[in-house]
């Protein structure tokens, strides 16, 4: 579906790029090519600007990071492709990604009409729905 184009997005530009992508999606216009969104959206994982040296232990650092990121980690595109190729789902099989984020796995599925996903991050869900409009993607509310 979308080509994997390796990106080196500087840490200090990720939040800005994410905001521009979300603005483009919200505008309802094709301001940014979908392939660019697929390759450039980073979510909140890695945006924390925390330094391990500022904490007394790795555990404190990891807990602070987890609180900020909500445990978010986007599986790299190549790994998603390899996993889907290994599983080799048919176009008739239903596939569920219970923590779909921006939907990286959906990019490699044979039939998006049989793809289901949910996530707790509304921004990531908005990106996934935009990129994979045929898939069934829901926002899971948490308290």
Give residue ranges: language-model regions:
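Hydrophobic/aromatic anchor residues within beta-strands of the central parallel beta-sheet
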Residues: 115, 135-137
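Short, conserved SAM-binding/catalytic segment
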Residues: 128-135
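Class I S-adenosyl-L-methionine
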Residues: 2-127
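Conserved small/polar residues in nucleotide/adenosyl-binding loops
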Residues: 141-142
């Amino acid at each position: 579906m979308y080509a994997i184009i390796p990106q080196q997005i500087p840490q200090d530009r990720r939040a800005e790029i994410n905001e521009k992508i979300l603005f483009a999606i919200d505008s309802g216009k094709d301001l940014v090519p979908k392939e660019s969104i697929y390759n450039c959206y980073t979510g909140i994982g890695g945006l924390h600007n925390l330094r391990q040296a500022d904490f007394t232990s790795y555990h404190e650092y990891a807990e602070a990071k987890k609180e900020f990121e909500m445990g978010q980690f986007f599986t790299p595109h190549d790994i998603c492709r390899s996993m889907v190729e290994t599983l080799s789902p048919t176009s008739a099989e239903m596939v569920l990604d219970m923590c779909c984020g921006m939907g990286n796995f959906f990019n490699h599925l044979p039939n998006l009409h049989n793809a289901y996903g949910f996530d707790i991050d509304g921004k990531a869900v908005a990106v996934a729905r935009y990129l994979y409009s045929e898939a069934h993607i829901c926002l899971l509310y948490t308290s």
